[in-house]
Amino acid sequence: MRKFLVILLVLSPLFLLAHTDHYKNYSNIEMEIFKDDEKIGESIFTFKKEENKFIVKNTTNFEVKLLGVTVFSINIRGTEEYIGDQLISFNSETFQNNKRKYVNLIFDEKKEKFIIDGSSYKGEADKENIIGHWWNHRILQTETQISPLSGSVKRQNIEFLGKEKIKLYNKEYDVEHFRLFSTDPNLPDNKKLNFEIWYDKKKALIIKVAYKRMGLWEYRLKKIQ
């Protein structure tokens, strides 16, 4: 029987630890991006400790071509900063088919809320929100996430689908399989969250992400350093 994640979280001690602790020994995580099983780009996260801050930088680039002509492209640069387990700032700039999107976020300690200036949302958000990036396994805990492209706040549900073994780049992983989807079923299709996620609990790493939108898209974990 499928079980919702809220049950799993009570039982799994790994989820209860500060998430930055899991990544302090990594310098980067590299994911390759595929569409219909053809590589189209990559998403790279780098991790750095500076005094009391934990800093995560992301570069994501991909390009979809049809008959040699680029029909869709993404170029993203973003930086997350944490003190302990608390996100204190996030900034990103995205060019989607040359259209600019952005997010400037800070944590207001007095209000204990995020203040967001984004291309699609300007306002406050609860501090329990996380940035919707695939390096962070806490995306499987939260009820809401902040779009790393535009700053919009999205409500989500998580469903546990089962345990599996998968193989990527000649490596085999024991994973837990989840579905992440929008809470509001009435959202337009292009605004809905609908992802399948394969998570390695022992390593506290998301191994693969897949979704369908005019084809099958996948983010596959290639390298950890």
Model-derived features: where do they sit?
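C-terminal segment of classical bacterial N-terminal signal peptides
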Residues: L14-A18
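Hydrophobic, well-structured mid-protein blocks that either form specific transmembrane helices
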Residues: S92-G132
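Alpha-helical transmembrane spans
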Residues: G132, N136-R138
